[in-house]
Amino acid sequence: MTAAKPNILVIWGDDIGIWNLSCYSRGMMGYQTPNIDRIANEGMLFTDSYGEQSCTAGRSSFITGQSVYRTGMSKVGMPGVDIGLQKEDPTIAELLKPLGYATGQFGKNHLGDLNKYLPTVHGFDEFFGNLYHLNAEEEPEHEDYPTAEEAPILRKALLPRGVIHSWATEEDSDEVDERYGPVGKQRIEDTGPLTKLRMETVDDETTSAAVDFIKRQHEADVPFFVWMNLTHMHFRTHTKPESRGQAGRWQSPYHDTMVDHDRNVGTLLDLVDELGIADDTIVIYSTDNGPHANSWPDGATTPFRSEKATNWEGAFRIPEMVRWPGKIKPGTVSNEIVQHHDWLPTFLAAAGDPDIVDKLKSGHKAGADGDTEYKVHIDGYNLLPYLTGEVDKSPRRGMIYFSDDGDVLGIRADNWKIVFMEQRCQGTLQVWFEPFTKLRAPKLFNLRTDPFERADVTSNTYWDWMIDRLFLMFYGSAIVTQFLETFKEFPPRQEPASFTISHAVEELEKFLATGGG
């Protein structure tokens, strides 16, 4: 492997709360995460890093470098629904393949469950993992779930797919699955359902597969890009019996599993050390979105307002840290704004292609064959000059907050957050059911003087303070308008999915139209 092409190891948890990592909370939660902390201590920790407000959105934003408003990938809805990652939207993996990278994805995907949406037809050489969030995959074990005898058509149409192991192939298979569609250029093995029992150890399974993949690439002297998506700590948490109590007295099974989660991160870090490739490997730890706090104590913790699926910082603000020995100064704490979109241009720059954003705007060939034409608008910025100390500021000065229905909830511009729509529900699962309230005039927050967005609730002078700064709402409107201008040339790819019954009915009607076989 040449120094110009570093390995890239991206490790994600699921719904990880900032305060559940001891590098942020300083042990306040009663346990430690020494392996995750090690990445922060040996690299750069971010305080102002943003994902999206839910799982699919955060994952699609990262892997495509595009806004969910652009890709339509804010959620994928029910199993079997024909919504997922489109072939026209290149992934980090597809852009790295022509540069000589081996690409592997392990763990949760959640970007569509049809064959055409699997990672191995979107630039990854190998995939081993699940396709949904955990609570959806344990539903078939519920006592009230319809049996095959009671509702055979419904069960067959809505049953989640199993844990998939797939490999990219050069040959285009002529096999067509009646539910999941054409197989395409991949070989697919269904390793069985992700049961509640298997959930206890599935992260160990996928971590082992990632270890094997990395070893093979190292032996072949090929640079690798690995996206390791651990399923923990998504609701519901199923803790190994032998792990119970390891977080300490008066703790919880959730914290016990956080210790296991940290241990899997350590397995990958230890491997990088054992292979002697630490100096040649970019390592990132992060997550998709803010915590699902309403399931506490089986849920994560954040100091920011509210939680996942809202407009507040608690939904979007995420833990993030990056290590690259010799390039990124260890022990750095960054207060600069970064967002998941930014890693695509950053990784490509690190791999030797700093002009990828401009290339993709005008048309660029990439993909596994190196000959697939892509023309897209990347919403990310190249962070590499900032990470390596060449410049003092992140190129990103703000971001736009979207709901999972594609609504513009607000914007951040430097210190300022301007809120157009707000979730007024204070907590519980109701935050997923109650609609956002559209404000007649936007609210304003200063995320430096009020980082936890408390002022409109607690301050006697909030409204006086805000009325003196109403001019900033026009600033916010101008930023959104500028963003929307890009859609003249690059229109939205598809509409977001829905958690309502509409998509399920559509799929059931399609299924019945084929005879329900």
Feature map (PLM): residue ranges:
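Formylglycine-dependent sulfatase
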Residues: 1-438, 442, 451-517
